[in-house]
Amino acid sequence: NDSNGDSDNAAFDPNIPVQVSGINPTTGGFGQRLVISGENFGNDPSIVNVFVGGKKAIVINVKNHSIYCLVPSQAYSGEIEVQISNGDNPVVSTIAEAKFEYVRKQLVSTLCGSRRDDGGYDTKDGPFNDCGAFGSPNWLEFDPKYPHLVYVAADRGAGDENEGNGNMRILDLKNQYVGTALTEGDMGGTNRGRALAFFDENHMAVAVDQGDELRAAVYGFTRNREAPEGDERNYKMWGNRLALVNFKACNTVTFHPVDGDMYFNSWDKGQFFKVEKQQIQEIFDGTRTTPADKEVLFQMDNGWEYNIRIHPTGNYAYIVSINKHYIQRTNYDWASKRFVTPFIVAGTAERAAYVDGIGTSARFNTPYQGVFVKNPEYA
């Protein structure tokens, strides 16, 4: 036993090959504790470097027959290399026959935005690491023409205590920059731009929450310039504001992905409205000068706040109730081209909590947007 201990504590010998005989465990993710077994590692952690998948690992301890380290992040390829530096001599390097199977962990981290030390924040354009923060963000939507641009609708009227505003922001994922798409003034002076949807590549609808049913519930905008290129950072690409439909207390807007009709709601009595595609097209074309007609397909009850998310096939939609804490489904009747009376698929009305479960036994607390996953790698 004493001889084994002496052997384990032996210093690195540059005249003897460095060998890796095994790794334990053989699979794991970022931060996994990893033991590399072998010969002639020495006893000095300061001269030993380990790379997993080409990424440098943190070496915790070294003995002549083993190295204890932590798996680095993004070590996808899994090759394990041990390097030993010995003064002015060439670096000794060896690669293990076995590969480490790197398992990606599901992590949530900050993309952009930060608060000041006093807890408040600034609302400003800037790179992801210096863009202030977002006042009451409500809805995210990708630009169909420029998929590296993500729009963020903000409901400044929701009571945020900080310095945010109701401007619609843009996340430029390619250039890692936050810009402004529409100001409160661009949206008719409202600071409650609740959601947005695209009629087509060059026409956008914005749901606004205001209290006069004779004013716009949904505004339409036309793209009047292309996305910025190079070092340019002007994201004001939308103009020619038009009232697509009038009503009050609108929380959401969406378009049927096949038939193209527009759907929006009202918090007032929980109405679920339909507007025909042809009328929206005429407004954008300039052949109709008044807001579109609307039809109530069904309604919930007083003070029902919700978002609508239609499945890409158009076969059905989810109604995500924000203030009633549950999710309904409404199927699409292709013959009549309208959504029918909804039914509950998850949660129970006015029972806010966080509980995993099936159907009405599940619980939500202020659910919001939701998304349908098209890429099977993310399903």
Q: Where do the PLM segments sit?
A:
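Short, exposed beta-strand/loop patches in secreted or surface proteins that constitute
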Residues: 27, 58-60, 196-197, 253, ...
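Gly/Pro-rich loop segments of beta-rich domains
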Residues: 36, 104-138, 164, 174-194, ...
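Glycine-centered loop/turn positions within well-structured domains
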Residues: 57, 65, 78, 119, ...
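Inter-blade boundary loops/turns of WD-repeat beta-propellers
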Residues: 85, 142-144, 171-173, 221-223, ...
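Conserved beta-strand positions in repeat-built beta-propeller and related beta-rich domains
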Residues: 142-144, 149-161, 198-199, 205-213, ...
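Beta-propeller domains
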Residues: 153-176
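Structural motif
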Residues: 160-168, 212-221, 269-276, 325-330
